[in-house]
């Protein structure tokens, strides 16, 4: 069996739903080799709790039905992400509790956003380790109206241990349409500017986007429009609510002397000032 976790998922899913029948799913099976991993999510009861929350998710052989609900992910993929990350953080209950709350939330947008994070964690196991992460504090919303302007970053890294890591990461699972609205959304702008104020170099901030829902160049274009619209505000003195020239030079380049210099950089979406935008 190539992937026994997916096999377990399939059996449990069909067992719970009693809707879809498939060959080989006539009895419940828990593979012994996965006992330790399943223990990390609370064993069989934890598995059933997860599946109950994701009853609206598409299965692996459901073709395209329902794929957009969870950013193109199937129930098989999401369970595997959940179990693997739970096992990785089994000795950091402070971190796992936050992730578990998001993954099992009654809010579909929160679950989808958490799955975006889980998928990224699983793809990059050497980066997202219990030792590398200091704190997790996440709140995901479907629309810009749901944004939390005063919330902390989703992930704070311990980059004293690993200087190659950013200090903060923000996970955004928006689609193209939503990204196209950020330049005119006060909540998003307020949150973004507060994040810029919290770092001393742009390398310490990363926005991790969901590449299943938006192309990175589309997201860069959205930030380009935001920068153009907010340039004058960003150059205001900090006591007036801006970043100030010195902070902008720290973040985006010492060669910036005024708003015009900044906007010259903004015009090119391949300029390093956009390097804080990352794909999962």
Feature map (PLM): residue ranges:
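Classical Sec-dependent N-terminal signal peptides that target proteins to the secretory pathway
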Residues: 2-22
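Catalytic toxin/effector domains delivered as secreted proteins or via bacterial secretion systems
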Residues: 26-280
């Amino acid at each position: 069996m190539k992937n026994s976790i997916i096999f377990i998922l399939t059996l449990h899913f069909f067992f719970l739903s009693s809707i879809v029948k498939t060959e080989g799913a006539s009895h419940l099976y828990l593979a012994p080799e996965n006992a330790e991993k399943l223990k990390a999510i609370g064993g069989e009861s934890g598995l059933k709790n997860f599946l109950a929350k994701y009853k609206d998710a598409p299965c692996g052989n459901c073709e395209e039905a329902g794929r957009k609900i969870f950013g193109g992910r199937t129930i098989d993929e999401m369970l595997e992400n959940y179990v693997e990350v739970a096992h990785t953080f089994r000795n950091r209950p402070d971190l796992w509790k936050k992730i578990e709350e998001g993954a099992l939330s009654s809010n579909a947008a929160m679950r989808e956003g958490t799955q975006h994070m889980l998928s990224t964690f699983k793809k990059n196991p050497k980066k997202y380790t219990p030792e590398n992460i200091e704190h997790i504090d996440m709140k995901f919303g479907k629309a810009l109206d749901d944004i939390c302007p005063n919330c902390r970053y989703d992930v704070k890294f311990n980059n004293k241990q690993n200087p190659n890591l950013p200090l903060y990461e923000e996970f955004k699972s928006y689609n193209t349409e939503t990204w196209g609205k950020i330049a005119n959304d006060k909540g998003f702008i307020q949150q973004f500017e507060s994040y810029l104020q919290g770092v001393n170099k742009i390398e310490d901030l990363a926005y991790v986007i969901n590449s299943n829902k938006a192309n990175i160049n589309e997201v860069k274009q959205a930030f380009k429009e935001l920068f153009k619209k907010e340039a004058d505000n960003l150059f205001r003195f900090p006591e007036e609510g801006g970043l100030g020239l010195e902070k902008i030079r720290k973040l985006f380049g010492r060669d910036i002397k005024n708003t015009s210099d900044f906007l010259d950089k903004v015009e090119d979406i391949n300029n390093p000032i956009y390097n804080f935008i990352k794909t999962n």
